[in-house]
């Protein structure tokens, strides 16, 4: 096959990448919301926050998104979604197969690809290969005001490199089972009064309900979604049923949107 391809030399390749990357970082160094983790709850939250018009930045330590979605159930490529979470998946055109009334099977690759695409199309910025190392805090009133970030590769190499800071009106811990951001804040800012009892063993029916109910603010400016909620609130895990994950993301997005709107009204 003969084809005419535009000639682009190495200097232009590098310059365009550096310029556009730096413009993104410069713009998002002051964000409305920073979400840590691009798993199901983080992507769901990003979709609804960006859709609400908030400047939303998602940091993912890996070079891919989806979190636990990609692993499916013990590497089986299917997952379970139950009502009313199916409405969120339908909203972003993810296909579902009903296996009993109100219970659906979803393909894991389609689930994470379309959910991520929906968040990006809504206006969220997702940056891979970045680890959130710490938080920014302020006093009077005491609150979380952003995050400190580092390249994941730098941390893996155990290099002593200072982070850079990203300001945010709200920080969402969507890091999963370890609730990494909230754990750091609890340890380093004891004045926040955060106590983390840890996640319990599996009890799927209760876990799905309790995770959504307990989603939300942990301290001023700091929120939990998804499996981070189970860790922070001492709730059971649920395994490869993902309804609560996307519902939790939507719930935290709604709470943050209301909180930021209230703060703008007061200002």
Curated annotation (Swiss-Prot):
Molecular function terms from GO: iron ion binding; pentosyltransferase activity
Keyword Metal-binding: yes
Residue positions binding glycine: 237
Keywords: Iron, Metal-binding, NAD, Thiamine biosynthesis, Transferase
Positions bound to Fe cation: 162, 177
Keyword Transmembrane helix: no
Pathway this chain belongs to: Cofactor biosynthesis; thiamine diphosphate biosynthesis
One Gene Ontology term from the biological process aspect of the record: thiamine biosynthetic process
Subunit record text: Homooctamer; tetramer of dimers.
Function of the protein: Involved in the biosynthesis of the thiazole moiety of thiamine. Catalyzes the conversion of NAD and glycine to adenosine diphosphate 5-(2-hydroxyethyl)-4-methylthiazole-2-carboxylate (ADT), an adenylated thiazole intermediate, using free sulfide as a source of sulfur.
Protein name in UniProt: Thiamine thiazole synthase
Organism: Saccharolobus solfataricus (strain ATCC 35092 / DSM 1617 / JCM 11322 / P2) (Sulfolobus solfataricus)
Gene field: thi4
């Amino acid at each position: 096959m003969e084809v005419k391809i535009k000639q682009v030399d190495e200097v232009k390749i590098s310059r365009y990448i550096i310029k556009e990357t730096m413009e993104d970082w410069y713009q998002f160094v002051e964000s409305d919301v920073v979400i840590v983790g691009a798993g199901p709850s983080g992507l769901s939250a990003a979709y609804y926050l960006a859709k609400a018009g908030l400047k939303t930045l998602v940091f993912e330590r890996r070079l891919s998104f989806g979190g636990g979605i990609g692993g499916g159930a013990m590497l089986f490529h299917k997952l379970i979604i139950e009502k009313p979470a199916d409405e969120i998946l339908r909203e972003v055109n993810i296909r579902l197969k009903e296996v009993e009334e109100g219970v659906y099977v979803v393909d894991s690759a389609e689930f994470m690809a379309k959910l991520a695409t929906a968040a990006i199309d809504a206006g969220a910025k997702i940056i891979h290969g970045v680890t959130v190392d710490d938080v920014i805090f302020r006093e009077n009133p005491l609150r979380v005001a952003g995050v400190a970030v580092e390249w994941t590769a730098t941390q893996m190499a155990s290099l002593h490199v200072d982070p850079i800071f990203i300001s945010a009106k709200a920080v969402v811990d969507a890091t999963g089972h370890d609730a990494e951001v909230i754990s750091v804040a609890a340890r380093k800012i004891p004045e926040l009064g955060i106590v983390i009892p840890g996640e319990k063993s599996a009890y799927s029916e209760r876990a799905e309900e309790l995770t959504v109910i307990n989603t939300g603010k942990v301290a001023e400016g700091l929120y939990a979604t998804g499996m981070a909620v189970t860790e922070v609130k001492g709730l059971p895990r649920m395994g490869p049923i993902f309804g609560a994950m996307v519902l939790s993301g939507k719930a935290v997005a709604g709470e943050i949107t209301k909180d930021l709107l209230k703060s703008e009204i007061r200002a």
